[in-house]
């Protein structure tokens, strides 16, 4: 127990250190006059978060922790949202957010769980000769998983006979043989396997709680309606939160949900104000943008597998990648975690995910973009573009990042994210969160 706590404490310290390093780089490079930065901080500190526009529909969609994955997918899809707060069923009536909410579930968490489940199931199917031959499907259950030494959500639930049988019917047994390798087995998983993931046991009964434990991207930290926009902007920039729930003291439900994108849209609406016009007219280079060098930007080649793109995003905790070609890394597209909706909603695409290249996936998305609200082309700017033009691109195109392209061949020079833009407008006063929100950075990142 002490060992796990030590590891957790080390991870928290590492996260804090990463946040500090990022923000120190931002502050040292953006070169805003101290008086202007203090004026901006004072202005944002005077704006209550309660004045921020409500989410569409005026109600934050929440999902119960015991909700099956299939139902969670439907809720997110029907509500046209990418994420939702998760209510701890054991403490649903609690007025303390620390007890009531477990975190935030999003499409990225679900798809990564689905992909891992598919991989593990394929290994189990290919490693058992009886199943590969299409007989004795029940032999591969929790026992088979344990024998193979698997870990993760699937190991916890076990591969029940019904799931294995349905998967076999979906295509694996059609290629009868002994000792098939796992990749081949996975390649043969057809539409029926997609249905297994969401409609058969044990996947059908897998809950949001289970996924949240395995694929948690960021801490859950709400602010009160009395908090300031400075608090929200610091959480969304320095501390890398993608969204900040808003609660009212003494009431259980989340009142609003402020995202990085919504804040940048709000900044876009500040045109005409002296402070905004001054900063937005500056070339991005004057603000130290992009904050990462070309070699630091994580990218994906167009001929690499889409599965590798999603894994790369997961491993680096980022929401998107530029698609590049050639030694000079010419920017030819963009893949983001938002695009995974298409993978979830199109079983014929999912069934071939192990063989699908980024380029092929982009082509399929391009033909369905209008229906699913997806955009595969990369939004770019030049090294001499103004911050205002970047903000306009982010807001008007509803994207999370703009790539900086250089030269005649649109070579990858850098990336500017929503987080980067917000960071340009704020700095953190000493001991700000301890003084204003009543908790330490360590507690925040431990949520």
Curated annotation (Swiss-Prot):
Residue(s) carrying Phosphoserine: 35
Domain CBS: 54-120, 214-275, 292-350, 374-433
Alphabetical list of SUPFAM superfamilies matching this protein: CBS-domain pair
GO cellular component terms listed in the entry, alphabetical order: mitochondrion
CDD domains in UniProt: CBS_pair_SF
Keyword terms: Acetylation, Carbohydrate metabolism, CBS domain, Phosphoprotein, Repeat
Residues bearing PTM N-acetylalanine: 2
Family: Belongs to the 5'-AMP-activated protein kinase gamma subunit family.
Quaternary structure (record): Subunit of a probable heterotrimeric complex consisting of an alpha catalytic (KIN10 or KIN11) subunit, and a beta (KINB) and a gamma (KING or SNF4) non-catalytic regulatory subunits.
Entry function: Regulatory subunit of the probable trimeric SNF1-related protein kinase (SnRK) complex, which may play a role in a signal transduction cascade regulating gene expression and carbohydrate metabolism in higher plants.
PANTHER family: AMP-ACTIVATED PROTEIN KINASE, GAMMA REGULATORY SUBUNIT, SNF1-RELATED PROTEIN KINASE REGULATORY SUBUNIT GAMMA-1-LIKE
Name of the molecule in the record: SNF1-related protein kinase regulatory subunit gamma-1-like
Organism name: Arabidopsis thaliana
Lineage start: Eukaryota, Viridiplantae, Streptophyta, Embryophyta, Tracheophyta
Gene label: CBSCBS2
């Amino acid at each position: 127990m002490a060992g796990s706590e030590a590891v957790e404490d080390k991870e928290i310290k590492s996260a804090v250190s990463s946040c500090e390093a990022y923000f120190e780089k931002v502050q040292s490079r953006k070169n805003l006059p101290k008086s202007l930065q203090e004026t901006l901080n004072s202005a944002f500190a005077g704006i209550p978060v309660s004045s921020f526009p409500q989410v569409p529909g005026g109600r934050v969609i929440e999902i119960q922790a015991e909700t099956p994955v299939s139902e969670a997918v439907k809720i997110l899809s029907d509500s046209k949202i990418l994420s939702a707060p998760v209510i701890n069923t054991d403490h649903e009536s609690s007025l303390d957010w620390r007890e009531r909410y477990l975190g935030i579930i999003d499409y990225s968490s679900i798809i990564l769980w689905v992909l891992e489940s598919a991989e593990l199931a394929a290994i189990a199917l290919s490693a058992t000769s009886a199943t590969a031959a299409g007989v004795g499907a029940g032999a591969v259950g929790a026992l088979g998983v344990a024998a193979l030494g698997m870990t993760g959500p699937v190991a916890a639930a076990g591969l029940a006979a019904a799931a294995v049988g349905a998967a076999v019917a979906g295509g694996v047994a059609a290629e009868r043989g002994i000792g098939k390798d796992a990749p081949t087995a996975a390649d043969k998983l057809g539409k029926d396997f997609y249905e297994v993931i969401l409609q058969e046991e044990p996947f059908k009964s897998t809950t949001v709680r289970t996924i949240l434990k395995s694929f948690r991207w960021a801490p859950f930290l709400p602010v009160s309606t009395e908090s300031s926009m400075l608090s929200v902007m610091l959480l969304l920039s320095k501390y890398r939160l993608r969204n900040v729930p808003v609660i009212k003291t003494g009431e259980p439900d989340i009142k609003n949900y402020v995202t990085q994108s919504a804040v940048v849209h709000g900044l876009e609406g500040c045109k005409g104000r002296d402070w905004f016009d001054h900063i937005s007219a500056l070339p991005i280079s004057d603000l130290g943008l992009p904050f990462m060098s070309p070699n630091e930007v994580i990218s994906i080649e167009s001929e690499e597998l889409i599965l590798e793109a999603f894994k790369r995003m997961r491993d680096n905790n980022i929401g998107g990648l530029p698609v590049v070609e050639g030694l000079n890394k010419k920017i030819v597209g963009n893949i983001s975690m938002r695009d995974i909706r298409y993978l979830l909603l199109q079983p014929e695409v999912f069934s071939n995910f192990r063989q699908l290249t980024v380029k092929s996936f982009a082509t399929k998305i391009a033909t369905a973009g209008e229906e699913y609200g997806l955009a595969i082309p990369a939004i770019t700017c030049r090294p001499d573009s103004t911050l205002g033009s970047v903000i306009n691109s982010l807001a008007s195109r509803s994207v999370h990042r703009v790539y900086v392209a250089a030269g005649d061949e649109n070579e990858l020079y850098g990336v500017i994210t929503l987080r980067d833009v917000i960071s340009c407008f704020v700095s953190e006063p000493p001991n700000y969160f301890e003084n204003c929100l009543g908790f330490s950075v360590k507690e925040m990142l431990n949520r």
